[in-house]
Amino acid sequence: MLFRSPEVGICAGNIEIIDSNGRVMPGKEQRKRDLPFRRLDFDDLFLDRKPGPMAPTLMFRREGLEKVGGFDPDIRLEDVYIELAVTKAGYVIDILGEVLAQYRKHPTNTYKNARFMVDNVFKTYSQFSDHPDYEQVIMRFRNSMFLKCSNRDKVLARELLSGLPLKYWNEKTFRGIARLFFS
């Protein structure tokens, strides 16, 4: 795919979720297994218009990585940053509609470390603060993480809520408030 399509900077596929013992998880855990082929540009990723690529399946065009200066050593959530940087440079991401990897779900997956995710996604998004919808993107992420943290990490949840202006409150905000104070 990369050879035939010079506009493609990253190629990826879907994933199948397995548990810590290597068993395939039930259907409700497989939201990212049967997604159709999709092509994403910068706005598709940044504005979350289409499901993004799965990190374990990423294959990069060397020229694309070189064009953006490679990975940023100050951002430890490398996949989100490099996907955005490569698409901002004018490339697209093609995601095949087939499973290319299994992803093991266990208690210490990176995405379960809320503080790490919040800090690094904010740091990543700040690299693209010139986008006209930057504030909306930040507030959507803040709302989403507030809801996730509201019954897991109440200190972080309160911090996220305190940075969420009323004009960005939505159903997730109210669900998070209910969890924060009643769970």
Locations of regions flagged by a protein language model:
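Residue-level structural signal for beta-strand termini and adjacent loop
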Residues: Q30-R31
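Glycine-centered small-residue hotspots that permit tight backbone geometry or close packing
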Residues: A12, G22, G69-G70, R152
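Residues within well-ordered alpha helices
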Residues: M1, G64-L65, T124-Q127
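Conserved donor NDP-sugar-binding/catalytic core segment of glycosyltransferases
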Residues: M1-G27
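C-terminal subregions of glycosyltransferases and related glycan-biosynthesis enzymes
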Residues: L47-D48, Y81, K88, I93, ...
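Conserved nucleotide-sugar donor-binding catalytic segment
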Residues: G13, D34-N120
